UniProtKB/Swiss-Prot annotation:
It holds the Pfam family adh_short_C2. Belongs to the short-chain dehydrogenases/reductases (SDR) family. This is Tropinone reductase 2. The gene is TR2. Substrate binds at residue 146. Disulfide bonds: none annotated. Pathway: Alkaloid biosynthesis; tropane alkaloid biosynthesis. Keywords: NADP, Oxidoreductase.
């Protein structure tokens, strides 16, 4: 089993691991000795990622899953439980989507999709994983939240609402599941350099909004996925055994700025 500062022998499920933040988390956990299972909606992306990870000697498996589907979430957890023989040390609820609109312009379909993937899936997978996390005798759940769960970010009303709900779920599960030796924490990214951000800044107004956020950061730059992944790994280390119920922001100092 793992020492205080590594994850040797641990098992992990990371949702949405084929790109961006999720990809960075899979790499970080695997490089520290964990056996990782991940999922994505895109089979080709998963195949490409698996080739890269296996060339590095990482222990990673993956399958396609549409997390907006309750039945596919159940199937995913059954697969993971079988793969890891009924024990799971780490669940990272990373998968999420954002649709940029003013609050009054969201359709019912927009709202349902964002809620189902960002919040409902994270809650459902956590509940499904509970017996396997408990069986490991040292379980960890990490929710990938956002500064948008605490700040009013333009065109992210529904996205921000899902992250705010996620933060409260983090605190509640931390209390409910402590008796089962399961710690629950959240990591809130600021502006992280991912393909999603690259797509977003193609829109001039969104680029301006993004630059305003970066200007509010003490470090005056975007973060890298590996910088956020390092915090996720820390929270899963035995060395973090007294940390639970926390939302930790990896945001270059954005949340520390009161607006001046």
């Amino acid at each position: 089993m793992a020492g205080r500062w590594n994850l040797e022998g641990c098992t992990a499920l990371v949702t949405g691991g084929s790109r961006g933040i999720g990809y960075g988390i899979v790499e970080e956990l695997a490089s520290l000795g964990a056996s990782v299972y991940t999922c994505s909606r895109n089979q080709k992306e998963l195949n490409d990622c698996l080739t890269q990870w296996r060339s590095k000697g990482f222990k990673v498996e993956a399958s396609v899953c549409d997390l907006s589907s309750r039945s596919e979430r159940q199937e995913l957890m059954n697969t993971v439980a079988n793969h890891f023989h009924g024990k799971l040390n780490i669940l990272v609820n990373n998968a999420g989507i954002v649709i940029y609109k003013e609050a009054k312009d969201y359709t019912v379909e927009d709202y349902s999709l964002i809620m189902s993937i960002n919040f409902e899936a994270a809650y459902h997978l956590s509940v499904l994983a509970h017996p396997f996390l408990k069986a490991s005798e040292r379980g960890n759940v990490v929710f990938i939240s956002s500064v948008s769960g605490a700040l009013a970010v333009p065109y992210e009303a529904v996205y921000g609402a899902t992250k705010g709900a996620m933060d409260q779920l983090t605190r509640c599960l931390a209390f409910e599941w402590a008796k089962d030796n399961i710690r629950v924490n959240g990591v809130g990214p600021g502006v992280i350099a991912t393909s999603l951000v690259e797509m977003t800044i193609q829109d001039p107004e969104q680029k301006e909004n993004l630059n305003k956020l970066i200007d509010r950061c003490a470090l005056r730059r975007m973060g890298e996925p590996k910088e956020l992944a390092a915090m996720v790994a820390f929270l899963c280390f035995p060395a973090a055994s007294y940390v639970t119920g926390q939302i930790i922001y990896v945001d270059g100092g954005l949340m520390a700025n009161c607006g001046f």
